[in-house]
C-alpha cells in the first residue's frame, strides 16, 4: 500500500528544512553545471545558499501570497517527516503557473514524486483557480519527464533540448475523473483481476470536451458476475449522483469482459457503455482502429498489462475497416443533420486516407491537418471549419451560422469521399 502524503505550508521556524535540502549536493545535483547569475549558487554542486538573514524576505514573498504564488513542504503522513518541497507561481504573460518540485535525495525512487506532484496540481487547480501549470527542463532527465507524464502533464513543445510540459485545467479535471472511475471499477472487480486501459482521443491528446468520448477497456481474468454487472452498468449514473456537475462521467465509453472472451470473441457476461446508453450483453469486439490505438498508444490504468496476448492488426485489417467507414459515408452522409457532429464525417474520411497512406492510425485532428497539409481535400474550407469546431466545440455549440452550415455538408462530404474511394481503388490495383 502506498504511503499517504500531504502538503504543509511551513512556519518561519521550519525554514531550516529548506536550508538543509538546498545545501545537500545529492538533492541538488540536478541543478549543477549551469551558468546561473544569482548569489548563492554553486555551479559545481547545484546547491543554493539560504542563510537565515534571507529568511524573512523570502517568507514574506512566498507565504500567504495566493493566488499569485504558493509554496509548501511535502509531508509523509506516516511519521510527519518533511521529504521535499513544491511551489507554483503565476506567469501572467504566458497565462499559466510555473511550478517546481524538489524531493530530498534519500526519498527518491520510492513512488513519492508523482503523488506529491498530484497534490500540487490539486491545490493549483482546485484552490488557486489555475488555468494551466507549466514546467520545463532538459529532455534527458527521463525520470523527471516520466514523473510529469504520470501526473497528467503532456509534452507542450521542445527547443534546444529543453522540453516544456503543460497540463490544462480541463486535462486535470478529466484525469481526476479517470482516476475516480478507475478506482470505482477496480473495487467492484477486485476479485476478478481486472486490467483497465485508456485509449483513443484521451491518450492521443485529441480529447475535446463537448465532442470526444473517454474510451476505456476492462479485461478480467475471472468472469463478471451478474451482481457485478448490475453494479457496473449504472456506475456512470451513480458517480454523477455524488458529483452532479461533473462533465466527464457521462463521456466514458467501452466494454468490460474477460480477456479470454475478448480474444476468442465467444459469448460472455459483458458490460457495455455507449453514447446512447448502457447494457449488459454477451459480446464485445474491437475494430482494427481501436486495436491499433490500444496496442500502440493505450495507457494501462490499473492491473497487469495483458496486451502481449493481443495481435496488432495487419494492413489488410485496416483497409477492410476503412472500406466499411467509406460505405457508411456513402449510405448515411448524403445529407446531414443540424449538429456539429456532422463534421465528424469529414474527419472520418481524413483518417481513412491517412491510414491507407501511412499504414497506421492517428488522431482525427492530426489526420485532418495532415490531409490539408498535403492538399488532399477537394473541399478544404469544409475540413478547415471541421477542424476549427473540433478543436473548440463548446465555443460553437450554439453558433447559428456553424449549425446552419452543418445541414448543408452532404455534397462536400461526398466530394471528399470520392478521394477516399480513389485511395481504396488504387490499393486494389
Annotate the PLM regions.
Residues 1-105, 154-173:
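GNAT-family acyltransferases
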Residues 109-123, 145-150:
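Conserved acetyl-CoA-binding loop-helix of GNAT-fold acetyltransferases
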Residues 229-339, 343, 352:
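Conserved NTP/Mg2+-binding pocket subregion across the NTase superfamily
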Amino acid at each position: 500500500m502506498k504511503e499517504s502524503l500531504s502538503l504543509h505550508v511551513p512556519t518561519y521556524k521550519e525554514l531550516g528544512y529548506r536550508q538543509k535540502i538546498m545545501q545537500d549536493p545529492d538533492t541538488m545535483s540536478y541543478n549543477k553545471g549551469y551558468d546561473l547569475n544569482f548569489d548563492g549558487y554553486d555551479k559545481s554542486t547545484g546547491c543554493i545558499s539560504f542563510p537565515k538573514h534571507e529568511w524573512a524576505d523570502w517568507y514574506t514573498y512566498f507565504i500567504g501570497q495566493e493566488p499569485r504564488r504558493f509554496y509548501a513542504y511535502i509531508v509523509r503522513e506516516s511519521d510527519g517527516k518533511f521529504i521535499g518541497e513544491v511551489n507554483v507561481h503565476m506567469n501572467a504573460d504566458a497565462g499559466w503557473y510555473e511550478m517546481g518540485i524538489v524531493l530530498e535525495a534519500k526519498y527518491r525512487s520510492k513512488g513519492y514524486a508523482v503523488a506529491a506532484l498530484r497534490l500540487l496540481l490539486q491545490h493549483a487547480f482546485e484552490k488557486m483557480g489555475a488555468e494551466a501549470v507549466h514546467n520545463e527542463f532538459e529532455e534527458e532527465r527521463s525520470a523527471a519527464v516520466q514523473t510529469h507524464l504520470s501526473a497528467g502533464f503532456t509534452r507542450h513543445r521542445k527547443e534546444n533540448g529543453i522540453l516544456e510540459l503543460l497540463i490544462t485545467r480541463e486535462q486535470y479535471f478529466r484525469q481526476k475523473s479517470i482516476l475516480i472511475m478507475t478506482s470505482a471499477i477496480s473495487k467492484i472487480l477486485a476479485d476478478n483481476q481486472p486490467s483497465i486501459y485508456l485509449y483513443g482521443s484521451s491518450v492521443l491528446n485529441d480529447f475535446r470536451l463537448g465532442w470526444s468520448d473517454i474510451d476505456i477497456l476492462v479485461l478480467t481474468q475471472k468472469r463478471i458476475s451478474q451482481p457485478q454487472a448490475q453494479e457496473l452498468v449504472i456506475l456512470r449514473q451513480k458517480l454523477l449522483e455524488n458529483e452532479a456537475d461533473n462533465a466527464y462521467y457521462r463521456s466514458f465509453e467501452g466494454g468490460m469482459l474477460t480477456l479470454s472472451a475478448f480474444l476468442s470473441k465467444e459469448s460472455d457476461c459483458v458490460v457495455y457503455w455507449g453514447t446512447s446508453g448502457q447494457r449488459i450483453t454477451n459480446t464485445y469486439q474491437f475494430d482494427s482502429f481501436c486495436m491499433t490505438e490500444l496496442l500502440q498508444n493505450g495507457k494501462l490504468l490499473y492491473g497487469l498489462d495483458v496486451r502481449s496476448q493481443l495481435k496488432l492488426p495487419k494492413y489488410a485489417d485496416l483497409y477492410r475497416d476503412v472500406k466499411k467507414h467509406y460505405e457508411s459515408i456513402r449510405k448515411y452522409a448524403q445529407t446531414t443533420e443540424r449538429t456539429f457532429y456532422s463534421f465528424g464525417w469529414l474527419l472520418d474520411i481524413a483518417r481513412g486516407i491517412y491510414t491507407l497512406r501511412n499504414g497506421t492510425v492517428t488522431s482525427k485532428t492530426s489526420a485532418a491537418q495532415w490531409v490539408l497539409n498535403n492538399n488532399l481535400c477537394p473541399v478544404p474550407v469544409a475540413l478547415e471549419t471541421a477542424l476549427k469546431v473540433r478543436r473548440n466545440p463548446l465555443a460553437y455549440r450554439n453558433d447559428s451560422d456553424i449549425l446552419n452550415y452543418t445541414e448543408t455538408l452532404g455534397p462536400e462530404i461526398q466530394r471528399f469521399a470520392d478521394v477516399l474511394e480513389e485511395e481504396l481503388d488504387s490499393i486494389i490495383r
